[in-house]
Amino acid sequence: MSNIAFYVVSDVHGYIFPTDFTSRNQYQPMGLLLANHVIEQDRRQYDQSFKIDNGDFLQGSPFCNYLIAHSGSSQPLVDFYNRMAFDFGTLGNHEFNYGLPYLKDTLRRLNYPVLCANIYENDSTLTDNGVQYFQVGDQTVGVIGLTTQFIPHWEQPEHIQSLTFHSAFATLQQHLPEMKRYADIIVV
């Protein structure tokens, strides 16, 4: 049996550097680069590890606000995320704050799979995959990405008008029988 670690980064909200940008000389114990440094140091002790982005990365910092206002592209943010070598990610509710075209462009640029099994556009999931399997030695790890179905309660309707949000719980129940057949370890 392999020694496996799961590292989850969540709610980064575009804070790449260890600062909240309120002053020039401020250092905070936060940010994607600092989290990645800690993860990379720790993961050496495991046979296998997974680095996961749990969503809410696309909106929330002055950096993200600058990108949408001045370039209309998330490319600089995506460049950082791609260099972090995530194994997979999922969507948070704030990924929808700048509209669906901006989100889709971001998803196309990411170099890791973004899993979301319960948000649909027309008849297929918004992301390429909802469930993915990874082989780790003699074990199979099954991963399902789920996002809150309550996004329509607080997101601007024009940002999500072509999407259908299914219950995360019901979606998990639907996928679990198959995942249990194929996976030794299930990650939600």
Predicted regions and their residues:
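Acidic, metal/ion-coordinating pockets
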Residues: M1-V188
